[in-house]
């Protein structure tokens, strides 16, 4: 049962730290979107990259080791550079309640330094969420192995970990999309999560959500996913919720028995109790019966017909609660020649899910065919069409 109440002003300190080249690019994208209530930090071994950053705080890693020339794709150099700057990292993190770490895995600085940032954050008791990318397959096995090792090391310290495989950019968006728009789509995953959580904590809303609720959902939960969906019109609540849950750019994860769910609904003054219920029902479909579910709303007078849903799901792959899991059904998103059918994709998700299927696809087959059956959110389709 959900309780309605007033949200008092919050003073939780949220930082987003971009580590290395990939992480730096991600926070530049977020800075351009003018997110309130968040402080950005750019950390790198490359002094030239830091000189181009618009972050309020920049941190040069490994002055003595790299001389400002980068880590040379060597994670051990990135790790040593971060160790050299450990005291400065601690100084930057002190007083922070929640930190997002973002980096590209497989290179030198992000792979080697990110676990050091996470370790220091854990020592300080900071709620830590990492959002990282994995290399394209064509970059080779060695780089992928380096990325996997970095992700494993990061997982030892963070509370929640989200991975975005770059290869999904090819599968979901198609090979003809511009490189700029492809990486913009990946950066939007982090943008949506940070904006959704920051809005819940820092902006007044109708549902009483505070930082303690966020910590409960995300603390020591391991594998996680996050997504954002926006829709308008009669079925906007259901469509936005399902688009947020789809998250085709994220690493393949098993939703069954999710132990924590954080939802932010942002809409105008016309948000109805029925729409609130529709979002809740979409969440109920995959969460464990014993999961901690926190749903908050933010009223934005500037939003007229649009409704935005941000979903953060944690504790994935755990079957302890006996949740029903996500009902995986084949969704026909392609034409007979294998190309994307954009007319079909423009139909609401729930209508496509209700169409009869000629065969049943089990979980493993579904994962192998994620391109054919992927539910692609509207903002990604628009990028492809532009």
UniProtKB/Swiss-Prot annotation:
Its protein name is: Cell division protein FtsZ
Q: Which residue positions does the secretion signal occupy?
A: none
Compartment list: Cytoplasm
Q: Name one GO biological process term.
A: division septum assembly
* Ligand binding (GTP): 21-25, 108-110, 139, 143, 187
Subunit field text: Homodimer. Polymerizes to form a dynamic ring structure in a strictly GTP-dependent manner. Interacts directly with several other division proteins.
**One Gene Ontology molecular-function label:** GTPase activity
Keywords assigned by UniProt, alphabetized: Cell cycle, Cell division, Cytoplasm, GTP-binding, Nucleotide-binding, Septation
